[in-house]
């Protein structure tokens, strides 16, 4: 089953979900490691091998980050076109509202983190290229230290929002699985059977438009 139903996530949604999750758990440690290398090089200097390793780590980080960006945009477009399976806790209005906000905060940060990183990359030059054939610069971004500094800071802020929303998202999934003992987590995995419908909730399109308005 490729598409969503009122009670089940389809294979395409699951592939988007787990591809993005895998990318997140790669890109964040790479960013931390790259920053640590950069700070060590700035503070103490380094040989050519260490500089080359830092450039490799940052290039990998940027390339995975842009892959996540375009995958997240495709995921959002797919969600708009699909019915959203009804929440298994739809009768718990406050909990359901909080889970929805965390979910779309997560997706908003999945867009904003790589976009701000991309702008920062475009405002600088000569270090750690993105591994793709489409060029390194955005046409509207000047080469500017102040622009680079601004978007570097925003990149860090949104990265922290991403981490916080990710932790809350995982905690909510575990709460459903361990405490509520419902199928919320299982139905996002492959090969699980559909569950019965629950109380009515807002569509994916409404949630996305609300998130974009924020």
Regions found by a protein language model. Give the residues of each.
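Membrane-embedded alpha-helical bundles that constitute the cytochrome b-like, heme-associated redox core
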Residues: 1-214
């Amino acid at each position: 089953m490729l598409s969503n139903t009122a009670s089940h996530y389809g294979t395409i949604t699951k592939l988007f979900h787990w591809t993005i999750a895998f990318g997140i758990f790669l890109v964040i440690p790479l960013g931390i490691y790259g920053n640590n290398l950069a700070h060590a090089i700035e503070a103490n200097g380094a040989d050519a091998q260490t500089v080359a390793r830092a450039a490799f780590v940052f290039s990998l980080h940027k390339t995975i980050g842009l892959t996540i960006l375009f995958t997240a945009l495709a995921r959002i477009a797919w969600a708009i076109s699909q019915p959203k399976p009804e929440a298994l806790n739809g009768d718990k209005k406050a909990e359901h509202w909080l889970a929805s906000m965390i979910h779309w905060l997560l997706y908003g940060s999945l867009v904003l983190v790589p976009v701000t990183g991309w702008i920062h990359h475009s405002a600088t030059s000569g270090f750690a290229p993105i591994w793709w054939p489409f060029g390194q610069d955005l046409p509207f971004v000047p080469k500017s230290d102040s622009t680079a500094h601004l978007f570097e800071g925003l990149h860090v802020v949104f990265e922290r929002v991403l981490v916080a929303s990710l932790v809350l998202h995982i905690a909510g999934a575990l709460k459903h699985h361990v405490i509520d003992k419902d199928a919320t987590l299982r139905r996002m995995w492959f090969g699980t059977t559909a569950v019965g419908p629950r109380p009515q909730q807002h569509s994916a399109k409404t949630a996305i438009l609300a998130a974009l308005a924020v």
